[in-house]
Curated annotation (Swiss-Prot):
GO cellular component, one term: plasma membrane
Primary subcellular site in the record, as a coarse category: membrane
Sequence intervals crossing the membrane: 22-42, 59-79, 154-174, 186-206
Annotated membrane topology: Multi-pass membrane protein
This protein's UniProt keywords: Cell membrane, Membrane, Transmembrane, Transmembrane helix
Stated name of the protein: Uncharacterized protein YmfE
Subcellular location: Cell membrane
Taxonomic path: Bacteria, Pseudomonadati, Pseudomonadota, Gammaproteobacteria, Enterobacterales
Amino acid sequence: MNNMFEPPKNYNEMLPKLHKATFLNTLIYCILLVIYEYIPLITLPTKYVPPIKDHESFINWALSFGILPCAFAIFAYLISGALDLHNNAAKLLRVRYLWDKHLIIKPLSRRAGVNRKLNKDEAHNVMSNLYYPEVRKIEDKHYIELFWNKVYYFWIFFEFSIIALISFLIIFFCKQMDIFHVEGSLLSLFFFVILSFSVSGIIFALTVKPRTESQVGKIPDDKIKEFFTKNNIN
């Protein structure tokens, strides 16, 4: 878990760190849900707990709060990786669309002298064949690492917000169907979900947005104009 706290140097390095962070955040969050009686304490007999070298004390501590926090943390880890949770959730909520449109495509279009809205194919072409290739050419490795550092922490908060929303919906459904007793306030839990998304938005506005704008600014004007002219985007 130690390398989880080290900032990634690129997107591929970020992904496994993000999955681990989501696992840990979900585990801690669900433990708090047990403590504040949002979900029941369902214990697991120790004879069913497999011995895992080097992590036995941590597992025993986690299971002291019941099987549900561990089970949901594993579930969150799996959907974080297998379903590419941060990316697909961002697409579903239009975060990626707005990010690309307002912070990358529009500024590049303006610098090329194009003031109209680009269609879907043109926008995809600009992202795939102009923005990404040019950004990869940036030689300042420290600058790139700083960018991924800011993006990494945004995705951590964003992905946790999605998990918090999913858990709220599950708890709400279970309470309505009387599957288990919920002592904690659903309104307070809902406000926590809103707070989580708000913090994600603040992190994006204060760190990711200026870093993205700075990256776009490093693409030379002549490269931008040449690309738009060559691809008949005018």
